[in-house]
Amino acid sequence: MKLKLHHINLCSTNVEAMDRFYRDVLTLGDEKPSELPPLNQGKGLVGDVSFVTDGAIQMHLTPKDVLNSFKSGQVVNPLERGHIAYRTDDIEAFMKHLDEQGIPYSDWGSDAVKGWHQVFFYDPDGNVIEVHQIVNT
């Protein structure tokens, strides 16, 4: 079970302004279309998302949604304050590892992002962490 940093998600009430800031000030560019996840609008994500990159790590700029947990039925809300995300090659083994560590998590499956099995959980300070695996759907 390998883990690799995949993206940083920042939530905003103004995605367009955030996009301009990261492109103009930090000179980040577009993510390659082949690297972009297919989003399931209305199932976790609502609104436009911007994807920028430094060429190595993606940054997902998403609309802030403080009511996401109520809408999705999930305990962990990755769209309230954002999150950091890791990609794994074995999501089942990772969930078993979380169970063994006694860490509760929300299993989103592929509801929000088609082809990604996502789980979200909190670190000791309440920061949201995502771990996902690319899966066939």
Task: Give the residues covered by each predicted segment.
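Core segments of cupin and vicinal oxygen chelate
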Residues: N9-I57
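N-terminal beta-strand motif that seeds the catalytic metal site of vicinal oxygen chelate
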Residues: M1-D19, K32, R81-Y86, N136-T137
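A short, acidic/glycine-rich surface segment
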Residues: E35-N40, L67-S72, D107
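Short acidic/polar mixed-charge low-complexity motifs
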Residues: G55-Q58, D125-N127
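Short amphipathic alpha-helices within nucleic acid-binding modules
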Residues: F21, E92-H97
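Vicinal oxygen chelate
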Residues: M95-T137
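Short loop/turn microsegments at loop-to-beta-strand junctions
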Residues: H6, G47, W116-H117
